Protein backbone atom coordinates (compact mmCIF):
# COMPACT_ATOMS: atom_id res chain seq x y z
CA UNK A 1 0.00 0.00 0.00
CA UNK A 2 2.80 2.40 0.93
CA UNK A 3 4.62 1.50 -2.28
CA UNK A 4 1.54 2.35 -4.37
CA UNK A 5 1.13 5.65 -2.52
CA UNK A 6 4.76 6.60 -3.12
CA UNK A 7 4.45 5.58 -6.78
CA UNK A 8 1.34 7.75 -7.15
CA UNK A 9 3.12 10.74 -5.63
CA UNK A 10 6.07 10.14 -7.95
CA UNK A 11 3.82 10.01 -11.02
CA UNK A 12 2.06 13.22 -9.98
CA UNK A 13 5.42 14.89 -9.44
CA UNK A 14 6.64 13.76 -12.86
CA UNK A 15 3.50 15.13 -14.48
CA UNK A 16 4.19 18.42 -12.76
CA UNK A 17 7.70 18.43 -14.19
CA UNK A 18 7.01 17.29 -17.76
CA UNK A 19 3.69 19.11 -18.01
CA UNK A 20 0.14 17.89 -18.51
CA UNK A 21 -2.80 18.97 -20.65
CA UNK A 22 -6.35 19.04 -19.32
CA UNK A 23 -9.34 19.01 -21.70
CA UNK A 24 -12.72 19.49 -20.04
CA UNK A 25 -16.26 19.88 -21.37
CA UNK A 26 -19.08 21.10 -19.17
CA UNK A 27 -22.74 20.67 -20.18
CA UNK A 28 -25.50 22.59 -18.39
CA UNK A 29 -29.20 22.01 -19.11
CA UNK A 30 -31.72 24.30 -17.41
CA UNK A 31 -35.52 24.32 -17.32
CA UNK A 32 -36.89 27.82 -16.80
CA UNK A 33 -40.29 28.81 -15.37
CA UNK A 34 -41.91 28.50 -18.81
CA UNK A 35 -40.65 24.90 -19.23
CA UNK A 36 -38.26 26.04 -21.95
CA UNK A 37 -34.88 24.37 -21.83
CA UNK A 38 -31.49 25.85 -22.62
CA UNK A 39 -28.33 23.86 -23.11
CA UNK A 40 -24.88 25.41 -22.86
CA UNK A 41 -21.66 23.54 -23.56
CA UNK A 42 -18.33 25.05 -22.53
CA UNK A 43 -14.97 23.65 -23.63
CA UNK A 44 -11.90 24.42 -21.51
CA UNK A 45 -8.37 23.43 -22.46
CA UNK A 46 -5.50 24.05 -20.04
CA UNK A 47 -7.63 26.61 -18.24
CA UNK A 48 -8.64 28.44 -21.41
CA UNK A 49 -12.29 28.77 -22.43
CA UNK A 50 -11.96 27.88 -26.12
CA UNK A 51 -15.42 26.71 -27.22
CA UNK A 52 -19.12 27.41 -26.56
CA UNK A 53 -22.33 25.81 -27.80
CA UNK A 54 -25.76 27.25 -26.93
CA UNK A 55 -29.35 26.43 -27.85
CA UNK A 56 -32.83 27.22 -26.54
CA UNK A 57 -35.82 24.90 -26.98
CA UNK A 58 -37.93 27.86 -28.12
CA UNK A 59 -35.72 28.20 -31.20
CA UNK A 60 -33.71 25.06 -31.84
CA UNK A 61 -32.75 26.23 -35.31
CA UNK A 62 -30.68 29.03 -33.78
CA UNK A 63 -28.22 26.69 -32.09
CA UNK A 64 -24.67 27.90 -32.51
CA UNK A 65 -21.16 26.62 -31.88
CA UNK A 66 -18.31 29.11 -31.65
CA UNK A 67 -14.63 29.19 -30.91
CA UNK A 68 -14.00 31.73 -28.16
CA UNK A 69 -10.25 32.23 -28.38
CA UNK A 70 -7.88 33.40 -31.11
CA UNK A 71 -6.12 30.09 -31.81
CA UNK A 72 -9.48 28.40 -32.52
CA UNK A 73 -9.47 30.20 -35.89
CA UNK A 74 -6.47 28.05 -36.83
CA UNK A 75 -8.29 24.91 -35.67
CA UNK A 76 -11.29 25.80 -37.86
CA UNK A 77 -8.99 26.47 -40.81
CA UNK A 78 -7.26 23.12 -40.39
CA UNK A 79 -10.55 21.27 -39.82
CA UNK A 80 -13.21 23.10 -41.91
CA UNK A 81 -16.10 20.92 -40.67
CA UNK A 82 -15.13 21.24 -37.00
CA UNK A 83 -17.75 23.78 -35.86
CA UNK A 84 -20.52 22.18 -37.94
CA UNK A 85 -19.71 18.82 -36.37
CA UNK A 86 -19.71 20.28 -32.86
CA UNK A 87 -23.04 21.96 -33.53
CA UNK A 88 -24.59 18.69 -34.77
CA UNK A 89 -23.24 16.88 -31.72
CA UNK A 90 -24.65 19.60 -29.46
CA UNK A 91 -28.08 19.30 -31.09
CA UNK A 92 -28.08 15.55 -30.43
CA UNK A 93 -27.04 16.03 -26.80
CA UNK A 94 -29.78 18.65 -26.41
CA UNK A 95 -32.48 16.05 -27.14
CA UNK A 96 -30.97 13.61 -24.64
CA UNK A 97 -30.61 16.32 -21.99
CA UNK A 98 -34.23 17.38 -22.41
CA UNK A 99 -35.40 13.81 -21.73
CA UNK A 100 -33.08 13.46 -18.72
CA UNK A 101 -34.29 16.77 -17.26
CA UNK A 102 -37.91 15.69 -17.46
CA UNK A 103 -37.14 12.35 -15.81
CA UNK A 104 -35.08 13.89 -13.00
CA UNK A 105 -37.64 16.60 -12.31
CA UNK A 106 -40.35 13.97 -11.94
CA UNK A 107 -38.19 11.63 -9.84
CA UNK A 108 -36.34 14.13 -7.64
CA UNK A 109 -38.86 16.95 -7.61
CA UNK A 110 -38.57 20.62 -8.53
CA UNK A 111 -36.35 22.46 -6.09
CA UNK A 112 -34.91 25.95 -6.44
CA UNK A 113 -34.31 25.22 -10.10
CA UNK A 114 -33.99 22.29 -12.47
CA UNK A 115 -30.35 22.14 -13.55
CA UNK A 116 -28.64 19.08 -14.99
CA UNK A 117 -24.86 19.19 -15.30
CA UNK A 118 -22.57 16.78 -17.06
CA UNK A 119 -18.78 16.99 -17.09
CA UNK A 120 -16.11 14.91 -18.74
CA UNK A 121 -12.38 15.48 -18.59
CA UNK A 122 -9.22 13.81 -19.84
CA UNK A 123 -5.67 14.50 -18.69
CA UNK A 124 -2.76 13.80 -21.03
CA UNK A 125 1.00 14.22 -20.97
CA UNK A 126 2.87 16.52 -23.34
CA UNK A 127 3.51 13.59 -25.69
CA UNK A 128 -0.21 12.70 -25.83
CA UNK A 129 -0.34 9.75 -23.43
CA UNK A 130 -3.57 9.32 -21.46
CA UNK A 131 -3.14 9.83 -17.71
CA UNK A 132 -6.56 10.11 -16.08
CA UNK A 133 -10.20 10.71 -16.93
CA UNK A 134 -13.41 11.78 -15.26
CA UNK A 135 -17.13 11.64 -16.01
CA UNK A 136 -19.76 13.11 -13.71
CA UNK A 137 -23.46 13.97 -13.61
CA UNK A 138 -25.11 16.41 -11.22
CA UNK A 139 -28.53 17.81 -10.32
CA UNK A 140 -29.19 21.23 -8.79
CA UNK A 141 -25.55 21.70 -7.85
CA UNK A 142 -24.95 18.29 -6.27
CA UNK A 143 -23.15 15.31 -7.78
CA UNK A 144 -25.36 12.30 -8.53
CA UNK A 145 -22.84 9.86 -9.99
CA UNK A 146 -19.18 9.79 -11.05
CA UNK A 147 -16.85 7.65 -13.12
CA UNK A 148 -13.23 8.20 -12.08
CA UNK A 149 -10.00 6.53 -10.95
CA UNK A 150 -9.71 3.38 -13.10
CA UNK A 151 -12.89 4.29 -15.06
CA UNK A 152 -14.58 0.96 -14.37
CA UNK A 153 -16.96 1.71 -11.51
CA UNK A 154 -19.60 4.41 -11.07
CA UNK A 155 -19.94 5.88 -7.57
CA UNK A 156 -22.85 7.69 -5.93
CA UNK A 157 -23.16 11.05 -4.16
CA UNK A 158 -22.73 12.23 -0.59
CA UNK A 159 -25.91 10.95 1.00
CA UNK A 160 -25.47 13.18 4.06
CA UNK A 161 -27.36 15.85 2.12
CA UNK A 162 -31.00 15.46 3.07
CA UNK A 163 -32.71 15.54 -0.33
CA UNK A 164 -30.15 13.14 -1.79
CA UNK A 165 -30.67 10.79 1.14
CA UNK A 166 -34.41 10.87 0.51
CA UNK A 167 -33.82 9.78 -3.09
CA UNK A 168 -31.07 7.22 -2.39
CA UNK A 169 -33.09 4.30 -3.75
CA UNK A 170 -33.70 6.03 -7.08
CA UNK A 171 -30.08 7.19 -7.47
CA UNK A 172 -28.59 3.81 -6.54
CA UNK A 173 -30.98 2.18 -9.00
CA UNK A 174 -29.82 4.48 -11.82
CA UNK A 175 -26.19 3.67 -11.08
CA UNK A 176 -26.88 -0.07 -10.92
CA UNK A 177 -28.65 0.04 -14.28
CA UNK A 178 -25.65 1.51 -16.10
CA UNK A 179 -24.50 -1.31 -18.33
CA UNK A 180 -20.90 -2.38 -18.78
CA UNK A 181 -21.27 -1.46 -22.44
CA UNK A 182 -22.19 2.15 -21.60
CA UNK A 183 -19.27 2.39 -19.18
CA UNK A 184 -16.93 1.03 -21.85
CA UNK A 185 -18.17 3.64 -24.34
CA UNK A 186 -17.44 6.46 -21.86
CA UNK A 187 -14.03 5.01 -20.98
CA UNK A 188 -13.06 4.58 -24.63
CA UNK A 189 -14.13 8.15 -25.36
CA UNK A 190 -11.94 9.56 -22.58
CA UNK A 191 -8.94 7.45 -23.57
CA UNK A 192 -9.53 7.85 -27.29
CA UNK A 193 -11.35 10.79 -28.86
CA UNK A 194 -10.89 13.14 -25.90
CA UNK A 195 -7.17 12.40 -25.70
CA UNK A 196 -6.72 12.78 -29.46
CA UNK A 197 -8.34 16.22 -29.47
CA UNK A 198 -6.24 17.23 -26.48
CA UNK A 199 -3.16 16.52 -28.60
CA UNK A 200 -4.63 18.50 -31.51
CA UNK A 201 -5.48 21.51 -29.37
CA UNK A 202 -2.02 21.50 -27.81
CA UNK A 203 -0.56 21.99 -31.28
CA UNK A 204 -2.55 25.19 -31.81
CA UNK A 205 -2.42 26.84 -28.40
CA UNK A 206 0.26 29.46 -27.69
CA UNK A 207 3.62 28.29 -26.33
CA UNK A 208 4.51 28.75 -22.68
CA UNK A 209 4.83 32.48 -22.00
CA UNK A 210 6.08 33.80 -18.69
CA UNK A 211 4.50 36.95 -17.29
CA UNK A 212 5.54 40.56 -17.20
CA UNK A 213 5.38 41.48 -13.50
CA UNK A 214 4.81 44.93 -12.02
CA UNK A 215 4.74 45.73 -8.31
CA UNK A 216 4.31 48.82 -6.20
CA UNK A 217 2.45 50.59 -3.41
CA UNK A 218 -0.97 52.26 -3.38
CA UNK A 219 -3.55 53.61 -0.93
CA UNK A 220 -0.79 54.81 1.39
CA UNK A 221 -2.22 56.33 4.59
CA UNK A 222 -0.40 57.01 7.88
CA UNK A 223 1.61 53.87 8.64
CA UNK A 224 -0.39 51.49 6.43
CA UNK A 225 -0.48 50.85 2.70
CA UNK A 226 -1.25 48.21 0.09
CA UNK A 227 1.49 46.42 -1.77
CA UNK A 228 0.29 45.18 -5.15
CA UNK A 229 1.76 42.81 -7.68
CA UNK A 230 0.28 42.21 -11.14
CA UNK A 231 1.30 39.64 -13.75
CA UNK A 232 0.47 40.17 -17.43
CA UNK A 233 0.54 38.05 -20.57
CA UNK A 234 1.31 34.58 -19.22
CA UNK A 235 0.32 31.13 -20.45
CA UNK A 236 -0.72 28.63 -19.20
CA UNK A 237 -2.96 30.12 -16.55
CA UNK A 238 -1.54 28.48 -13.42
CA UNK A 239 0.41 31.07 -11.42
CA UNK A 240 1.32 31.71 -7.80
CA UNK A 241 1.73 35.24 -6.42
CA UNK A 242 2.99 35.67 -2.84
CA UNK A 243 4.43 38.49 -0.73
CA UNK A 244 7.58 37.95 1.33
CA UNK A 245 8.57 39.95 4.42
CA UNK A 246 12.03 39.41 5.90
CA UNK A 247 12.34 36.08 4.14
CA UNK A 248 8.97 34.74 5.28
CA UNK A 249 5.46 34.88 3.88
CA UNK A 250 3.27 37.61 5.29
CA UNK A 251 1.25 36.49 8.35
CA UNK A 252 -2.01 34.63 7.84
CA UNK A 253 -4.02 37.61 9.08
CA UNK A 254 -2.52 39.58 6.18
CA UNK A 255 -3.08 36.94 3.52
CA UNK A 256 -2.91 38.44 0.00
CA UNK A 257 -6.18 39.10 -1.81
CA UNK A 258 -6.10 38.08 -5.47
CA UNK A 259 -8.38 39.22 -8.25
CA UNK A 260 -9.89 36.55 -10.52
CA UNK A 261 -7.66 35.03 -13.18
CA UNK A 262 -8.74 36.73 -16.41
CA UNK A 263 -8.09 35.64 -20.01
CA UNK A 264 -7.12 38.04 -22.79
CA UNK A 265 -7.94 37.94 -26.50
CA UNK A 266 -4.45 36.73 -27.42
CA UNK A 267 -4.93 33.58 -25.33
CA UNK A 268 -2.80 34.64 -22.36
CA UNK A 269 -3.88 35.53 -18.83
CA UNK A 270 -3.38 38.26 -16.27
CA UNK A 271 -3.91 38.40 -12.53
CA UNK A 272 -3.16 40.83 -9.72
CA UNK A 273 -2.84 40.43 -5.95
CA UNK A 274 -2.47 42.89 -3.09
CA UNK A 275 -1.84 42.79 0.64
CA UNK A 276 -2.14 45.26 3.53
CA UNK A 277 1.31 46.12 4.91
CA UNK A 278 3.07 48.51 7.29
CA UNK A 279 5.13 51.44 6.05
CA UNK A 280 8.89 51.81 6.60
CA UNK A 281 9.37 48.12 5.80
CA UNK A 282 10.60 46.22 2.79
CA UNK A 283 8.61 43.51 1.05
CA UNK A 284 9.14 41.25 -1.92
CA UNK A 285 6.60 40.04 -4.45
CA UNK A 286 7.41 36.51 -5.59
CA UNK A 287 5.75 35.19 -8.76
CA UNK A 288 6.07 31.54 -9.75
CA UNK A 289 4.92 30.33 -13.17
CA UNK A 290 5.82 26.70 -13.76
CA UNK A 291 9.55 26.36 -13.09
CA UNK A 292 10.08 30.12 -13.59
CA UNK A 293 10.28 32.49 -10.61
CA UNK A 294 10.89 36.22 -10.29
CA UNK A 295 11.05 38.48 -7.23
CA UNK A 296 10.14 42.18 -7.27
CA UNK A 297 11.30 44.30 -4.29
CA UNK A 298 8.70 46.68 -2.85
CA UNK A 299 9.90 49.40 -0.47
CA UNK A 300 7.41 51.43 1.55
CA UNK A 301 8.32 54.74 3.21
CA UNK A 302 5.94 56.57 5.52
CA UNK A 303 4.72 59.87 4.01
CA UNK A 304 5.30 61.56 7.39
CA UNK A 305 8.87 60.29 7.76
CA UNK A 306 11.15 63.31 7.16
CA UNK A 307 14.20 61.88 8.98
CA UNK A 308 15.46 60.22 5.82
CA UNK A 309 15.75 63.55 4.04
CA UNK A 310 14.28 62.07 0.88
CA UNK A 311 11.91 64.18 -1.19
CA UNK A 312 8.63 62.39 -1.91
CA UNK A 313 8.37 61.24 -5.48
CA UNK A 314 6.34 63.73 -7.52
CA UNK A 315 6.14 63.18 -11.28
CA UNK A 316 5.52 66.86 -12.16
CA UNK A 317 8.32 68.11 -9.94
CA UNK A 318 10.71 65.51 -11.32
CA UNK A 319 9.79 66.43 -14.88
CA UNK A 320 10.38 70.12 -14.19
CA UNK A 321 13.67 69.34 -12.44
CA UNK A 322 14.84 67.17 -15.33
CA UNK A 323 13.92 69.89 -17.83
CA UNK A 324 15.84 72.52 -15.85
CA UNK A 325 18.86 70.22 -15.60
CA UNK A 326 18.94 69.60 -19.35
CA UNK A 327 18.59 73.34 -20.06
CA UNK A 328 21.45 74.17 -17.70
CA UNK A 329 23.73 71.62 -19.35
CA UNK A 330 22.92 72.95 -22.83
CA UNK A 331 23.56 76.55 -21.72
CA UNK A 332 26.89 75.57 -20.17
CA UNK A 333 27.94 73.83 -23.39
CA UNK A 334 26.95 76.89 -25.42
CA UNK A 335 28.97 79.21 -23.18
CA UNK A 336 31.97 76.90 -23.41
CA UNK A 337 31.70 76.92 -27.20
CA UNK A 338 31.50 80.72 -27.30
CA UNK A 339 34.48 81.04 -24.96
CA UNK A 340 36.50 78.63 -27.07
CA UNK A 341 35.61 80.55 -30.23
CA UNK A 342 36.56 83.87 -28.60
CA UNK A 343 39.92 82.54 -27.37
CA UNK A 344 40.64 81.05 -30.76
CA UNK A 345 39.76 84.35 -32.49
CA UNK A 346 41.79 86.38 -29.99
CA UNK A 347 44.82 84.13 -30.40
CA UNK A 348 44.58 84.29 -34.20
CA UNK A 349 44.21 88.09 -34.17
CA UNK A 350 47.17 88.47 -31.83
CA UNK A 351 49.34 86.32 -34.10
CA UNK A 352 48.20 88.31 -37.15
CA UNK A 353 49.09 91.66 -35.56
CA UNK A 354 52.47 90.31 -34.48
CA UNK A 355 53.25 89.16 -38.01
CA UNK A 356 52.08 92.49 -39.41
CA UNK A 357 54.35 94.43 -37.03
CA UNK A 358 57.32 92.23 -37.90
CA UNK A 359 56.74 92.75 -41.63
CA UNK A 360 56.55 96.53 -41.16
CA UNK A 361 59.86 96.63 -39.27
CA UNK A 362 61.52 94.42 -41.90
CA UNK A 363 60.33 96.69 -44.71
CA UNK A 364 61.52 99.81 -42.89
CA UNK A 365 65.00 98.36 -42.34
CA UNK A 366 65.38 97.47 -46.03
CA UNK A 367 64.31 100.90 -47.19
CA UNK A 368 66.92 102.54 -45.01
UniProtKB/Swiss-Prot annotation:
Membrane topology category: Single-pass membrane protein
Job description of the protein: Plays a role in the protection against host NK cell cytotoxicity by interacting with and modulating the activity of the host inhibitory leukocyte Ig-like receptor 1/LILRB1, which is expressed on monocytes, dendritic cells, as well as subsets of T and NK cells. UL18 exerts an inhibitory effect on LIR-1+ NK cells, while it stimulates LIR-1- NK cell. These modulations prevent lysis of the infected cells by NK cells.
Listed InterPro entries: Ig-like_dom_sf, Ig-like_fold, Ig_C1-set, MHC_class-I_related, MHC_I-like_Ag-recog, MHC_I-like_Ag-recog_sf, MHC_I/II-like_Ag-recog
Chain residue ranges for the region called Alpha-1-like: 19-114
Chain positions covered by the region annotation Alpha-2-like: 115-208
A GO CC term assigned to this protein in UniProt: host cell membrane
UniProt keyword list: Glycoprotein, Host membrane, Host-virus interaction, Immunity, Membrane, MHC I, Modulation of host NK-cell activity by virus, Signal, Transmembrane, Transmembrane helix, Viral immunoevasion
Transmembrane segments: 321-342
One Gene Ontology term from the biological process aspect of the record: negative regulation of type II interferon production
Glycosylation sites: 56, 66, 74, 95, 123, 127, 150, 167, 177, 193, 240, 282, 291
Pfam families with a match to the protein in the record: C1-set, MHC_I
Region Alpha-3-like: start-end pairs: 209-303
Designated name of the protein: Glycoprotein UL18
Leader sequence residues: 1-18
Subcellular location: Host membrane
Taxonomy, superkingdom: Viruses
Primary location recorded for the protein, binned into one broad class: host cell
Record's subunit section: Interacts with host LILRB1.
Organism of provenance: Human cytomegalovirus (strain AD169)
